[in-house]
Each structure stands twice: as C-alpha cells, then as structure tokens.
Amino acid sequence: MKNILQSTECLEDQQNVSIRPNLLDEFIGQSSVVNNLKIFINAAYTRKEPMDHVLLYGPPGLGKTTLAHIIAKELKVNFRSTAGPLLSKAGDLAAILTNLQAKDILFIDEIHRLNRNIEEILYSAMEDFCLDIIVGEGCGARTLRVDLPKFTLVGATTRIGLLSNPLRDRFGIPIHLEFYSTEELIKVIQRAAKVIKTDISDSGAQEISLRARGTPRIALRLLRRIRDFIEVTEHNKTITDTFADKALLRLGIDKLGLDRQDIQYLKFIHDSNNPTGIDTISSGLSEDTGNIEETIEPYLIKINFIQRTPRGRVITQKAISYLKEQSYI
C-alpha cells in the first residue's frame, strides 16, 4: 500500500534539511515574500484563525518546500505533506483531509499534477471545508457531506500555467518566488558552510554563487561537491575561489553555471537555424519536455540566451557570442 503522506522531497532536499531555516527571520532572500508572509501569519495567529490558502510558484529549488515548513512552524500547527502524483484516487485525498486537525497545514507539492477529479474534490474542501462523498451506486447512490476542520492548503508548483483557473482562484495568497541575486546566494552559501562545518572564503562563496543559476538548491549542491573535493585532495581545507573554479570545471559547470545539458540545448537550437518547437527539441535531445521547460529553460530565459516565441524557441545573439567565446561552437 502506497504512503500518500510520504516525503515529497528529492534526496537533495532531504540532505539540505539540517541547513534549512526554521523561521522567516532565518530565511535568506525573497524579502518582499518574507515580509508579506510575516503579516499574513501574524494576522491569522492573532485572530486564532487558519491562514488563507497559499500557492507557491516559480522555478525549482527556490525554497517553496522550505517556506511551507516555515509557515507551519510560525503558526505552531501540524504539517502534513503529499504530492500531486501520489493522489491518484479520490479516496487518497479524502483520507488525508478527514485526518487533519483545525489550522493544520496540508502541503501538496507538484499540485499541477493533480488529476481533474481530485481537483474538483478540493474545491469544496478549500472553500466550504467540507467533503462530498458519493455512497452507493446507480439509482441508489446518494451524496454524503462530511465537515472538515478549517485547514490551510499550501500548494507548490513550477508550472502555474497547468493549474486550472478554478483551483488557482481558490488560493487567497499566491506567491511568486524569483531567482536569487549573487549577493543573496553568497549569504546562503556562507550560512550553509557554517552549518556543515566547512571553511570558505568570501571569494570562494562568490565563485559558487556566480555558477548557481540564481538557485539556492544548486548552490548547496555545488558547495557539498566542492567540499568533497577539498577534503580528499587538499591539506588546506578552506574553499577559495581558485579551488572552487577548478572543482566546478571538473564537474562540468562553466562560468555562467551552464552544464552539458544546457550547452547541448543551445547548440541544438543554434544548428536548427530557425525557431524550434519544444517537441522537436525534446526529440532531438531525448529529453522530457517537462524537464526542458522546468529545469533548462527558465535560467536561459533569465540570462537572455533564448526567447520563447509563438513559432518556437529562438537563440539570442548574446548566447551565440558566448558559445563562440567558450569554443562551444
């Protein structure tokens, strides 16, 4: 029997648990988001009411799961976690909802992957805090309404466009997470280095931040890998910019944070000489379209290396110049 309340986090996020901030005051970056959340949380706590439903959306690795945990801790309520793909039947969701307590946080990761039948059950649960269950079959079928405790649903998605309008509109607090600045990532890296007891110079932290694609999860992953290198190969245990650069090059991460997958993607579009559709790119690279749209493209769009047009993806002159400069083409 599957566990629909099992951890929804990838192994990488589980490794980051010891580094994860527990309170909003410890959370680095996303300052406007943090400031607004403090208001919403304090208001709900003061009124002794459940917080309104929250939708966290943005590229992977920016702290959606971390913020969901923090909301529960700040409100001093229970945290329940599941994921859209785990909820395949109406009974799966009903089992979770009927076991919630008042003001609990229910976190649904990858909420865009809920099937429509499950979504429809959520409508009344979110709006009226009730669950309509059909009992019996055929002419003898009847609807049984079950009252639910007033809870807070926190949904997380990397693809908000895949959410239906009725579901999206039921979230009273939509929150968009942005890519991090270099300065913010440096703080993330320095804080993490202290937690994992690794010495790092300011220049070393900056070198990692410049290649972390504006994403804390990537910054922490690179920090751990560089720590592996320095513990095995160096007597001086301080991560400097020079050592970080050498280690990252060995990992196949260039000075902009691009890896082999990114370069293959850019070269494929460049060699096509025309706007290229996502399905064509997926077929040519043997990559899932979802992975391309969620993992590869957001950062390339941010740094103005590609553009999405109605006719397909187009590589920019800035990207072409970079590919030539680095001898990729």
Swiss-Prot record:
Reaction(s) catalysed by this chain's protein: ATP + H2O = ADP + phosphate + H(+)
A Pfam family per the record: RuvB_C
First-level EC class: hydrolase
Binding site for Mg(2+): 65
Gene Ontology biological-process annotations: DNA recombination; DNA repair
Binding locations of DNA: 308, 313
Keyword annotations from UniProtKB, A to Z: ATP-binding, Cytoplasm, DNA damage, DNA recombination, DNA repair, DNA-binding, Hydrolase, Nucleotide-binding
Region (Small ATPAse domain (RuvB-S)): 181-252
E.C. code: 3.6.4.-
Compartment list: Cytoplasm
Subunit structure: Homohexamer. Forms an RuvA(8)-RuvB(12)-Holliday junction (HJ) complex. HJ DNA is sandwiched between 2 RuvA tetramers; dsDNA enters through RuvA and exits via RuvB. An RuvB hexamer assembles on each DNA strand where it exits the tetramer. Each RuvB hexamer is contacted by two RuvA subunits (via domain III) on 2 adjacent RuvB subunits; this complex drives branch migration. In the full resolvosome a probable DNA-RuvA(4)-RuvB(12)-RuvC(2) complex forms which resolves the HJ.
Similarity comment: Belongs to the RuvB family.
Protein's name according to its UniProt entry: Holliday junction branch migration complex subunit RuvB
Source organism of this protein record: Ehrlichia canis (strain Jake)
